[in-house]
């Protein structure tokens, strides 16, 4: 019997678009020499829904339900950037209580996003147990979201000038109980995962990105901070009321997959610190700005709060909130990095241009460089450490 010769040429393999490790409908065309990766070409666009064009034909409040479909694991951040941009453009003041509520919701959403990164990331490298652990804590988070917004996901909670509803009775106590409980769970994750020798073998020294390289690629979020750059927009831009709280930016120097894991684990603990301080210091007062005006056609200047010239932004399905003829770039520190909106108004209720800067799309661009000369199994580790959601990448 003749033995066939060993194939020595290159092999091209398709990973995705529905491979379980692809974190969505991402397709990778991988060129292999044995188990060594020679080239990797990401193919995007399978989840493109024209989100930027839709924004040009909707008022801001009409568009809010759409934005929760970008990063559907951290919807509070997409809502925040959608209302922050017109607030800045129209010089709308947000009540202090509403700002505190926003910070609490944003940090809870950050924890939820990092939890649903941690479980699949561990499953990618062969550890199934943490995948079930994170759903235990995530369920408690979603109970808090459901009690305050009415929805477990796709909350549609933020409004121009505030939030849709105040925190219900007893919610703050439940949130504090969750914070105390969750700190013990993070300690459990670190005990089970961080010092596990098998885990360290899979992630240490894999997918290294230097600090200058990260800046040149435009990386942000944990991808940037794990490369030795302590850059966090909550500290840099002082949006909402983050400057009133005592917390530290989490960062590492090594730039590998382990460093990105450590940054996200540390961020969950810091988020709990911010939430506890916000709950302790939350002021009274209104949860929305009821005095966001629209121009009165009669030209009256002395008006009462209940006159027709007042437009109650949160109370109408499609309020007449004009976007002045200006351009503006707004950004927030989302769990995956810098989420930005470049908006141009033209004295209309619809934005003339609505450009989205998704952190996942920018961070994904470095993937081909990271996986070259690595093993095939390392692709899952590196891709998982980047943390992408294809709804945000493809928009």
UniProtKB/Swiss-Prot annotation:
Gene Ontology biological-process annotations: photosynthesis, light reaction
Subcellular location as annotated: Plastid, Chloroplast thylakoid membrane
Reactions listed under catalytic activity: a plastoquinone + NADH + (n+1) H(+)(in) = a plastoquinol + NAD(+) + n H(+)(out); a plastoquinone + NADPH + (n+1) H(+)(in) = a plastoquinol + NADP(+) + n H(+)(out)
Keyword annotations: Chloroplast, Membrane, NAD, NADP, Plastid, Plastoquinone, Quinone, Thylakoid, Translocase, Transport
Single Gene Ontology MF annotation: NAD binding
This protein's record includes keyword Thylakoid: yes
Keyword NAD: yes
Membrane topology recorded in Swiss-Prot or TrEMBL: Peripheral membrane protein
Family, similarity comment: Belongs to the complex I 49 kDa subunit family.
Name this polypeptide is given: NAD(P)H-quinone oxidoreductase subunit H, chloroplastic
Lineage of source species: Eukaryota, Viridiplantae, Streptophyta, Embryophyta, Tracheophyta
The encoding gene: ndhH
